[in-house]
UniProtKB/Swiss-Prot annotation:
Belongs to the geminiviridae transcriptional activator protein family. It is found in: Host nucleus; Host cytoplasm. Pfam families: Gemini_AL2 (PF01440). It comes from the Viruses. Its main location: host cell. It comes from Indian cassava mosaic virus. This is Transcriptional activator protein. Residues 98-114 have a biased composition (Polar residues). Strong activator of the late viral genes promoters. Enhances the expression of the capsid protein and nuclear shuttle protein. Acts as a suppressor of RNA-mediated gene silencing, also known as post-transcriptional gene silencing (PTGS), a mechanism of plant viral defense that limits the accumulation of viral RNAs. Suppresses the host RNA silencing by inhibiting adenosine kinase 2 (ADK2), a kinase involved in a general methylation pathway.
Length: 135
């Protein structure tokens, strides 16, 4: 006969397949957002603090992020309407090149400057070279 009160001694765990089946039936909590360009996207309840860029426009899904991207008088952060100076100037030394590929130094042929100080490297025996390769 089964006890009337649940006890940890008499508890059987629900099989994982049953848990997965129940989780699949659960409705996905998400919100549909329509954009000005005619596109729409869905925001999952757990992803509400992430933004993205679509067709050159940054879209935000959180109130904190909207505060940073609001412009003009709507912005709670920038209520001062005076003329602002540019914070990052295009001066020599700043990386303001249009291409994002950074040039790599050319590989040189010969000994490196690190080995220039060692004299007598030609005098190493085969056992010395085997030891150094094993390190």
């Amino acid at each position: 006969m089964r006890p009337s009160s649940p006890s940890k001694d008499h508890y059987t765990q629900v099989p994982i397949k049953v848990q997965h089946r129940a989780a699949k039936r659960k409705r996905i909590r998400r919100k549909r957002v329509d954009l000005n360009c005619g596109c729409s996207y869905y925001v999952h309840i757990n992803c509400h603090n992430h933004g993205f860029t679509h067709r050159g426009t940054h879209h935000c899904s959180s109130g904190d992020e909207w505060r940073l991207y609001l412009g003009g008088t709507k912005s709670p952060l920038f209520q001062d309407h005076s003329t602002r100076q540019q914070t990052v100037r295009n001066e020599p030394g700043h990386n303001n090149r249009p291409d994002t590929v950074q040039p790599q130094p050319e590989e040189s042929v010969g000994t490196t400057s690190m080995l220039d100080g060692f004299q007598g490297l030609d005098d190493l025996t085969a056992s010395d070279l085997a030891f150094l390769e094993g390190i």
